[in-house]
Structures are given as structure tokens and as C-alpha cells.
Amino acid sequence: MTMGEALAEARARIGSAEAKLLLRHVLGCSASEIAAHPERALDESQASHYADMVARRAAGEPVAYLLGSREFYGREFRVTPAVLIPRPETELLVETALSKVSRGDTPCVLDLGAGSGCVAITLALELGCAVTAVDVSAEALAVARDNAAWLGARVNFVESDWFAAIDGEFDLIVGNPPYVAEGDPHLAEGDLRFEPMTALACGSDGLAAIRRILADAPRHLKPGGWLLLEHGYDQAEAMRELLAGAGFVALERHRDLAGIIRVSGVIMPE
């Protein structure tokens, strides 16, 4: 089978862009090589591997898991089914966090729900400081540690159920906790079917994890420290009420490129 023939079969199942992306991954070649040499033959192993990848994608498996990586904030992160796939909207959380740190400062930073480590590692590299990151999943932390080693980031990863194994206070606490309601029909659709449910959903309204974080965060924030949390597209008002109920003031709300509030932040009173 030639590259051109393999692509033609794959396009009928998963579309042209993904067919080319998976073929590049299998062959380790560029898009220009594929375009220039459609007559080039695949060996038996390559053809079998490519057919398997196409079948898995056609069944709905996320491209990021098939490739084993996903780009986030200009860097490639290893991903496996043990971690949530990094999303572009989470870059808003990183950008907001960076805006809270003055140039030259070396803040003490905590990331809640590390997953692949994309947020903690990005902050560590962008700020040039050490970051602590927690996750309840040992499997997720293994992926995060690999990413930190690969990218050269100073991150202390701790297996912890939110603040349970954490001592001390921080200048900046960030988190992308699960915020989808359990039973939400979207959880049975698309890529979400393959991602770790504990990283996606928590509680009947999706806010159970956030309530736990807000209950303990004041004990771990330095005076003047910031708490920044990503949340669902329709949870801005609920977040305002929860943050006010937890005694926080000076609420900030940050919108994504579509104008939707996706990050809420508060400052610990001096």
C-alpha cells in the first residue's frame, strides 16, 4: 500500500487533516514529504500501525491520546488516558496567573489538580520559580513528572486530595478542578468519553470540588495572595456566590476569546 492509497482510505473514515496527522506520526515524516511522494510504499508494520490508529480515531479516541502529546502554551506535553487533555481555554488561567506576578518576583505557587502538569510546568518556566502541584492520581503525577523532567521545570509534585498533604502558605494558588456535573450528557460524547472522569466531573452541580477548595484555601493563602480557578462557561454567577460565601472580596472575572467568563479570582485580604 502506498501513502496515497492509505490516505485515501483514511480520509473516508476520519477526514483529511487527521488522516495526514496520524500518517505523519506513524512514519515520522513531514507533511511536505507525504504530499511530494504519495507513491511511496508503507511496509507491513507501518500499514498495520496506521490502520489501527485510524480505526481508533474513527471510534472516537482523542487524537492527543493517539499521538501521545498535546501542545499547551507553546510547549509539547506528553498525555495519556490517565490525564485530562490540555485545552486552549486553560491558557487563560495561566495568563491570568502570570499577570498577578510582578517582574522579578519569585512567588510561592501551588497548582491544584496537576494532571499532565501543563499549568504548573508552564508557570514554573515562565516565572523562573519553583512550583508545588498536587493531584490525587498517582498515574497522573507520573505523567506530570515526566513532562517536568523533559521540559526542565522545577515542580514539586505531591500526591494529595487537594490540600490534604499540603502545609504552608502560598502567594498564588491556581486550579483547574473538575467542574462538570455528574450525569451531564456531554460526558458520554466525543473525547470526554475517553478522559478520566475524576478530572472532569464532581458532584450533582459540578461544584463539589470547588467548594472543598474554597473551604481550605484561606488557610493556605498569604495575605495579598491570589486564588484563581477555572470553571464552566455557565458557572460565573455560582462562582461569585461561592467566593463571597467563603469570605473573599475583590472578585475578578476573566473572559476567554469568546467573551465567556472562565476564570474567577480573589485576593486574600492583607
Over which residues does each language-model region extend?
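Non-catalytic nucleic-acid substrate-recognition regions in nucleic-acid-modifying enzymes
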Residues: 1-16
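Conserved AdoMet
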Residues: 21-99
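Conserved beta-strand segments of alpha/beta enzyme cores
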Residues: 76, 130, 154-156, 249-252
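Conserved SAM/SAH cofactor-binding pocket of Class I
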Residues: 88-186, 192
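Short alpha-helix
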Residues: 233-246
